[in-house]
């Protein structure tokens, strides 16, 4: 499947905060929550809640951390261990070990200065439910976690 085809039905969400974690030596590490469970997000024409367990089926997928969903600006990848994903009671957590590319260094510095304070993720939905009365969509299962 071509890269653009993967994103054809993808939805993107901006969530939570992104933080700098300086580890031993010169490593550049960013971490935060891509999604927070049971928290309503106002998407304009409806609100959305991501349910615990929504990501259970995609945790072993090859997921990339990208700058602005651009496949040319890869910050990390689960396949090679530079992106780690985990779930806890709060949500879907990520930890990215950045490489030495100039764009990664620039991105890291922008987060460190506070110019960039949020992150987003792209996904497709497998199962959802609606509360029509309150116009709230619950994301019960994610089909693909793209970035």
Give residue ranges: language-model regions.
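Polar/acidic, low-complexity leader/linker segments enriched in S/T/G and N/D
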Residues: 1-59
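Residue microenvironments linked to proteolytic maturation
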Residues: 21-24, 29-31, 64, 82-147
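Flexible, active-site-adjacent loop/turn segments at secondary-structure boundaries
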Residues: 35, 53, 73, 137-140
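Short, flexible beta-strand-to-coil junctions
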Residues: 35-39, 68-70, 124-126
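Short, surface-exposed beta-strand/loop "edge" segments at domain boundaries and coil↔beta transitions
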Residues: 37-43, 71-75, 102-105
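A glycine-rich, hydrophobic loop/mini-helix early in the fold
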Residues: 52-96
């Amino acid at each position: 499947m071509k890269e653009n085809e993967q994103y054809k039905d993808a939805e993107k969400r901006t969530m939570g905060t992104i933080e700098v974690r300086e580890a031993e030596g010169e490593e550049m590490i960013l971490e935060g929550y891509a999604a927070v469970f049971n928290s309503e997000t106002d998407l304009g024409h409806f609100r959305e809640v991501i349910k615990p367990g929504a990501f259970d089926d995609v945790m072993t997928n090859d997921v990339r951390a990208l700058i602005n969903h651009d496949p040319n600006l890869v910050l990390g990848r689960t396949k090679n261990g530079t992106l780690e994903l985990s779930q806890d009671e709060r949500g879907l957590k990520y930890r990215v070990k950045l490489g030495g590319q100039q764009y990664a260094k620039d991105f890291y510095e922008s987060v460190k200065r506070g110019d960039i304070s949020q992150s987003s993720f792209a996904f497709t939905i497998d199962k959802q439910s609606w509360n029509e009365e309150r116009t709230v969509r619950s994301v019960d299962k994610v089909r693909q976690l793209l970035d």
